[in-house]
Amino acid sequence: MRNIRNFSIIAHVDHGKSTLADRIIQLCGGLQAREMEAQVLDSNPIERERGITIKAQSVSLPYTAKDGQTYHLNFIDTPGHVDFSYEVSRSLAACEGALLVVDAAQGVEAQSVANCYTAVEQGLEVVPVLNKIDLPTADVDRAKAEIEAVIGIDAEDAVAVSAKTGLNIDLVLEAIVHRIPPPKPRETDKLQALIIDSWFDNYLGVVSLVRVMQGEIKPGSKILVMSTGRTHLVDKVGVFTPKRKELPALGAGEVGWINASIKDVHGAPVGDTLTLAGDPAPHALPGFQEMQPRVFAGLFPVDAEDYPDLREALDKLRLNDAALRFEPESSEAMGFGFRCGFLGMLHMEIVQERLEREYNLDLISTAPTVVYEVLKTDGTVINMDNPAKLPQLNLVQEIREPIIRANVLTPEEYIGNIIKLCEEKRGTQIGINYLGSQVQISYELPMAEVVLDFFDKLKSVSRGYASLDYHFVRFDAGPFVRVDVLINGDKVDALSLIVHRSHADRRGRELCEKMKDLIPRQMFDVAIQAAIGSQIISRSTVKAMRKNVLAKCYGGDVSRKKKLLEKQKEGKKRMKQVGRVEIPQEAFLAVLQMDK
């Protein structure tokens, strides 16, 4: 165990984590030069296209240090996006140290701070690494000063590297070996292994990534999953080098994969403890807290026959994505589908994209909403993730919305714009800290305002320089109402939204105008109305397409023309009673683009 080093690479989006991981793999000989490609650990095509990391990936490499000893490096490349911060905390639970990568040209950003605090809270040794020093705009001294001022850790011995050109990567490896402590032995010698991640493989069944804290796992041993109480027989164990490599056993302190032919998707929950069935450990390891989804949306198949396929696809995805929640839902407008819970908008986009690509499904998604707490008049509190399920207003005492604490890091010149944006979003300022050339602004904001487009607007008012990190704080009561959309007098449940009373009229008006452009013209007038309860707050009409019935009347009496027009009107009226309006997918997403 003395020569094992477990560490994660943490950083803000785009500061060069995956590129640094590539260089470390190359230097330790994990892959030959011809097998190397950029971001070799981002295996999913969506990750490669967007240039972001979504899943944390682990690699085990041998490294012969300058002191002549061979060390085993187990490292995990983590995502940088705020939606996937739970992936980072899970990865850190399996490590003793972390490399904090900071872009020397951009300086410290919000996620660098948030991830670093997570690492320090878990008692990890943090080694700062300044990346991109080959850029002409890189300023190593400023970046060091910012790390000390903003994060508050000593950056005197920060390693300055360029992951792109491979400069000084050997110094990073030496720093890992000498500064990150080896795994500590536990007080018990019985097997304890923490499940960091699980995914579904079509040939092997469920494969789990584990960190063995104590004891060892061998093929043929019978293991017990402590939370479910089920036992399984281990088929194979091994490590990723990044290729999957089988080993005769995984010992204490190591990070590797195990395959126990678990067929059930929920058989190996993330954060659970594995132990030997014949000689179990006295207690489970402290896992990590379950991530609660914050954003909910309905996903419906375009073709109703795809419903069973959608269920199977979501089941497989959930194994790979511990934060995804879903339950069946039926909607009058859309038929059968699922109400899904996500961590944020990026998470939602990626799940929908994966379902459409990997499982060939055509999906319609409804506008995302957050979870509200509803206090009913009989004193019960319910959590409501679907506006259509809001009880009748006479049964509701108060509605509470989720509030988040947002930390924004920005260069000084954009403060005015950012404060204005936060005020528009009903924010309450908590504090402003000046840290060198950067400013840290703290606000409490309603989550519903942040979820939809706050991130995009923040980037545009600060020319892309501001960065955001947020976490949930509490629920607050407020004057909320549900705005329903009626099309030709029929309520469309998938378009209902909950808004603050002060914004209700404006949102209703904007929604009707937006829908008017998106619903195709019919042979009869289509009335689009926004209503709060029985009170109509706005209306717009999609005019009917009509034939010019007077075209063949040349001159003649006016009563002849009137008769023809009346006859046409009667026909349209009859048609309106039986006609149904098809609502296109764009209309369901109109709610998203209302402020644009």
Swiss-Prot record:
GO terms for cellular component: plasma membrane. Keywords: Cell inner membrane, Cell membrane, GTP-binding, Hydrolase, Membrane, Nucleotide-binding, Protein biosynthesis. The keyword Nucleotide-binding applies. It is found in: Cell inner membrane. The keyword Cell membrane applies. It comes from the Bacteria. It is a peripheral membrane protein. GO terms for molecular function: GTP binding; GTPase activity; guanosine tetraphosphate binding; ribosome binding; translation elongation factor activity. Its EC number is 3.6.5.n1. It catalyses: GTP + H2O = GDP + phosphate + H(+). Signal peptide: none annotated. Residues 2-184 form the tr-type G domain. One of its GO terms (biological process) is positive regulation of translation. Required for accurate and efficient protein synthesis under certain stress conditions. May act as a fidelity factor of the translation reaction, by catalyzing a one-codon backward translocation of tRNAs on improperly translocated ribosomes. Back-translocation proceeds from a post-translocation (POST) complex to a pre-translocation (PRE) complex, thus giving elongation factor G a second chance to translocate the tRNAs correctly. Binds to ribosomes in a GTP-dependent manner. This is Elongation factor 4. It comes from Xanthomonas euvesicatoria pv. vesicatoria (strain 85-10). The gene is lepA.
